[in-house]
Regions:
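Alpha-helical transmembrane spans of integral membrane proteins, capturing the lipid-embedded, hydrophobic core
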Residues: 12, 60-63, 80, 84-88, ...
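Membrane-interface loops
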Residues: 28-29, 71-153
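Juxtamembrane/transmembrane-helix boundary motifs in multi-pass membrane proteins
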Residues: 2, 43-46, 67-75, 79, ...
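Loop-to-helix transition at the N-terminal end of transmembrane alpha-helices
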Residues: 36-47, 51-52, 81-84, 179, ...
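Alpha-helical transmembrane segments
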Residues: 7-19, 83-87, 154-158, 208-214
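Canonical alpha-helical transmembrane segments
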Residues: 63-67, 187-189
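Membrane-embedded catalytic cores of phosphoryl/pyrophosphoryl-handling enzymes
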Residues: 113-251
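N-terminal transmembrane-helix/juxtamembrane module of multi-pass inner/ER membrane proteins
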Residues: 1-61, 93-118, 252
Length: 253
């Protein structure tokens, strides 16, 4: 077992421990206390800005963001596809299995801040945190993140992930569990990224094109987010992540 696999297993085990702790009464009370404290900060931030930031964790947005790394790294390409396909089933499966309700289903509406709509479905793990840290881990494992920037980027991704608490969509533990699970997957699948196979690469390409087309379509028609404001500016996320690639290719010409 190499170092990446060991770290992956440790982080995955941490996620499982957090899931178990999530059922203890003292942890539930602490989770609620921290939620109320962090969530109250959201009331002092512009709702449009909060919505814009929190949707950077949307899977469709991150698929668009992955286009540039995919363009430059075959390893990242293999990792993001394999991790995403497994991650979809893992994240959704845990939500159904654990069936822990969101804050909106438990906390009185007048006791916390929420960016509409009020979400009340399954809470654990946070899909946005899962997707953010899966994407970040793919960048790390594929060698696209310099060590000097690792801590800074971890902090930035955590800020984005915890906006889910600020908008009233998730408990703090949901974020930690989602981030741990998402970060562990590419580490556990790292060996797949080093295997060169024309058949696998062709399949990966097909899956990536399908997922990318779905993401682009839903963002362009304004149907990728639960938030109306995000749906109105889906084009902006596309512009942010695809314009650098267009610029670099124009420079080459």
């Amino acid at each position: 077992m190499n170092r990446q696999h060991k770290i992956g297993f440790i982080v995955f085990a941490l996620a499982l421990v957090l899931i178990c702790l999530n059922y203890l009464d003292p942890v539930i009370a602490l989770n609620n206390y921290i939620f109320i404290g962090l969530n109250s900060v959201g009331a002092f931030i512009n709702q449009s800005a909060l919505t814009f930031l929190t949707e950077f964790g949307n899977a469709a947005v991150l698929l668009i963001a992955s286009v540039i790394p995919v363009y430059y790294s075959r390893k990242f390409f293999r990792l993001i596809i394999s991790s995403t396909l497994i991650g979809i089933f893992l994240s959704r499966g845990l939500k159904i299995l654990l069936d822990i309700p969101r804050p909106g289903a438990i906390v009185q509406r007048e006791d916390f801040f929420v960016v509409e709509p009020l979400l009340t479905s399954q809470s654990v793990p946070s899909g946005h945190a899962f997707s953010l840290f899966l994407f970040f881990s793919c960048l790390v494992v594929s060698g696209m993140i310099k060590k000097n920037y690792f801590a800074l980027l971890i902090f930035a991704f955590l800020i984005l992930a915890f906006t889910r608490v600020l908008v009233g969509a998730h408990w703090p533990m949901d974020i930690l569990i989602g981030a741990s699970l998402g970060f562990s997957l590419p580490l556990l699948l790292a060996s797949l990224a080093n295997r060169s196979s024309k058949i696998l690469d062709t399949l990966y390409s097909v899956f990536f094109i399908i997922l990318l087309c779905i993401a682009l379509y839903t963002m362009l028609i304004g149907n990728f987010s639960t938030y109306d404001f995000a749906n109105e500016i889906g084009w902006l996320y596309i512009l942010i992540f695809l314009s650098p690639l267009l610029f670099l290719n124009l420079v080459k010409i």
